[in-house]
Design a protein with these regions (language model features):
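N-terminal accessory scaffold of Fe(II)-dependent oxygenases
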Residues: 1-218, 228-306
Length: 306
C-alpha cells in the first residue's frame, strides 16, 4: 500500500546529504528533494561530462523527436552513433531532439562502473532492479510531462543546466494522461512548455514547481509526480538518471509490467518509411573513356513496433 501513496504538497525540499540512511528517510516523504551531490561523489561529475558522448562516438544512442509525442499515439526513436546524434542536436535550431533510455550505451562503454559506484550513496535496501541512463538534448528541447512508478529516481546535472517543471499526482485530472505500454511510459498529452489551444483551458488550472538544476546537484523525483525537463541553451548539457526498484515496488508494478509484456507479444515490426540517399556513382567506361554518372538510391530502413 505504501508504494501507491503520494504526497501532494507543491514544494521542493532541500537537504544536506549526510549518509544513505538519512537520504532514504527524506525520500520516504515522497516530496521532490534537491541536494548537492558533487561533494559526495566528485569523480561521478569528473568522469561523466560533455565528452562522454564524443569519446564513445562509435556506440549507439536513442534519439527522439518531441513532436512525435503530440502528433499521435506511436513514439518512435532512431538509433544513431553518438557522434551523429551529437551533431544533430548541435545543429537543431528548432529544439526538437533529445536522447534518453541509453542503458545499452552505458553498458557497452566504460561508463557503467562509474554509475555503479553511486549505489553506495543512493541505493535503498532490498533493491532488485537498478537502471542507469544518460541524457542530453538540443538547445531548449524538452521531454514530455510524465510520471514514473519506480521506488527511487535520481537525476543529476553534470554540465550545462536544466529547468524542470513538476506537479503532484492530483493534477492528473487536467493532464489528459496516456499510459503507453508499448514504450512503458506514462505521460500527458499536454505540452506544458507551449500548450496548444485545445488544452489551454485545462493547463490554466494547473500549478507547477519550476526551478533550475545546475551542475553538481541531484534531484529525487518521487513516484507519481509529473515532471518535464528543458535542456539549457548550452547543447553540451549532460544529465544522468539512476533508478531503483525495491522488492515491494516490483510487486506493486506487476500489473503494469504484465500489460507491457503482453503488448510486446502483440507487436510486429513493419517498415514505416525509407530515407532515399542519392549518391552519384562515377564509373569510367574503358571503351569510351566517359564518366557514367548513375544516381544510386539506397534505402535506409526505419522500423516501428506496433
Amino acid at each position: 500500500i505504501n508504494q501507491l501513496k503520494t504526497s501532494e504538497d507543491l514544494e521542493v525540499y532541500e537537504m544536506d546529504y549526510t549518509n544513505n540512511q538519512y537520504l532514504q528517510e527524506v525520500c520516504n516523504i515522497k516530496q521532490p528533494v534537491l541536494f548537492n551531490y558533487d561533494s559526495i561523489s566528485p569523480e561521478f561529475y569528473e568522469q561523466i561530462n560533455a565528452n562522454s558522448f564524443t569519446s564513445n562516438n562509435n556506440h549507439d544512442v536513442k534519439v527522439k523527436d518531441i513532436r512525435d509525442y503530440y502528433k499521435g499515439e506511436s513514439i518512435d526513436y532512431i538509433v544513431l552513433p553518438a557522434s551523429s546524434a551529437t551533431n544533430l542536436m548541435k545543429t537543431d535550431t528548432r529544439s526538437n531532439y533529445f536522447t534518453e533510455n541509453n542503458e545499452d550505451f552505458i553498458e557497452n562503454t566504460d561508463l557503467y562502473h562509474i554509475f555503479h559506484s553511486n549505489d553506495t550513496h543512493l541505493k535503498p535496501q532490498l533493491s532488485m532492479i537498478t537502471k542507469y541512463d544518460i541524457m542530453t538534448g538540443s538547445s531548449k528541447s524538452v521531454t514530455p510531462l510524465r510520471y514514473h512508478t519506480d521506488f527511487r529516481k535520481f537525476i543529476s546535472v553534470h554540465s550545462g543546466k536544466i529547468k524542470i517543471k513538476m506537479t503532484p499526482w492530483k493534477s492528473h485530472k487536467y493532464l489528459h494522461p496516456h499510459r503507453d505500454f508499448e514504450n512503458y511510459e506514462f505521460r500527458s498529452r499536454i505540452n506544458v512548455w507551449n500548450p496548444d489551444k485545445q488544452h489551454k483551458n485545462d493547463f490554466d488550472k494547473l500549478r507547477f514547481l519550476e526551478f533550475d538544476i545546475t551542475p553538481g546537484n541531484a534531484l529525487h523525483i518521487p513516484p507519481y509526480w509529473w515532471y518535464s525537463i528543458q535542456f539549457n541553451d548550452d547543447s553540451d548539457t549532460i544529465v544522468t538518471s539512476i533508478t531503483y526498484n525495491s522488492v515491494m515496488n516490483c510487486v506493486s508494478n506487476l500489473p503494469n509490467w504484465g500489460m507491457y509484456y503482453l503488448q510486446q507479444t502483440n507487436t510486429k515490426t513493419k517498415i514505416t518509411k525509407t530515407l532515399p540517399i542519392e549518391i552519384t556513382n562515377e564509373e569510367v567506361d574503358d571503351n569510351s573513356n566517359k564518366i557514367d554518372e548513375t544516381p544510386v538510391q539506397p534505402e535506409v530502413e526505419m522500423t516501428q513496433e506496433i
